[in-house]
Curated annotation (Swiss-Prot):
Phylogenetic lineage: Bacteria, Pseudomonadati, Pseudomonadota, Gammaproteobacteria, Alteromonadales
InterPro entries reported for this sequence: DHBP_synth_RibB-like_a/b_dom, Sua5-like_dom, TC-AMP_synthase, TC-AMP_synthase_SUA5
Enzyme class: transferase
Entry keyword set: ATP-binding, Cytoplasm, Nucleotide-binding, Nucleotidyltransferase, Transferase, tRNA processing
UniProt-listed PROSITE patterns: YRDC
Localization (cell): Cytoplasm
UniProt-recorded Gene Ontology molecular function terms: ATP binding; double-stranded RNA binding; L-threonylcarbamoyladenylate synthase; tRNA binding
Provenance organism: Pseudoalteromonas atlantica (strain T6c / ATCC BAA-1087)
SUPFAM superfamilies: YrdC/RibB
Protein's name according to its UniProt entry: Threonylcarbamoyl-AMP synthase
Family, per entry: Belongs to the SUA5 family. TsaC subfamily.
Gene from which this protein is expressed: tsaC
EC number: 2.7.7.87
């Protein structure tokens, strides 16, 4: 870590384990450092989400996701389809690495990952030099926040708000299985 990072408020909060809300391609998301178990647990508590469900990681590029993915276990027949869909709003369930944190993968042998085209997400991932947890900014049973005001109404001052514009998608990312190609979520 170089000295110029010490005055980056986002990076300081990220490294301190804070949870933040930020615009994604379609809705506001909640994020944190995927390697910080306390931060992920705080995010899950805010969302009222069970850890067993797992979470999505979003990166600036596939290289950022490699520590969490067992790249050698991705079927050769699926690689072109997966990698040609990025950057973009498609999340893939890929085989998890042996070191992928259980608080991110839940009870699955797979990990949900996406390479984003959203300029703000790309910037945040570049500044952190790693992926972010990315899950919709809402609590169980409520629709995802579509504005900074909605984020504030859901979470008050419990998250750090990074304001910005949503991307052009009308719904959260499609989720597909990296082995079967089956669509798991098609909003």
């Amino acid at each position: 870590m170089t000295a110029n990072h010490t005055d980056d408020p986002f990076l300081l909060d990220y490294l301190a384990g804070k949870v933040f809300a930020y615009p994604t391609e379609a809705v506001f998301g909640l994020g944190c450092d995927p390697d910080n178990e306390q931060a992920v647990n705080k995010l899950l508590a805010l969302k009222q989400r069970d850890v067993s469900k797992g979470l999505i990681l979003v990166g600036d590029n596939y290289s950022q996701l490699l520590p969490y993915v067992d790249d050698s276990a991705i079927k050769m027949t699926k690689r072109t389809e997966i990698f040609s869909s990025w950057p973009g709003p498609i999340t893939w369930l890929l085989p998890k690495s042996k070191t992928a944190p259980s608080w991110v993968t839940g009870e699955s042998e797979f990990i949900a990952v996406r390479v984003s085209a959203h300029p703000l997400i790309k910037d945040l991932c570049q500044r952190a030099n790693k992926p972010l947890v990315s899950t919709s900014a809402n609590t169980a049973g409520h629709p995802p926040a579509l504005s900074a005001d909605e984020v504030t109404s859901y979470f008050s001052n419990q998250v750090i708000l990074i304001d910005g514009s949503l991307g052009g998608s009308r719904s959260p990312s499609k989720i597909r299985h990296g082995h079967s190609g089956q669509t798991i979520r098609d909003n």
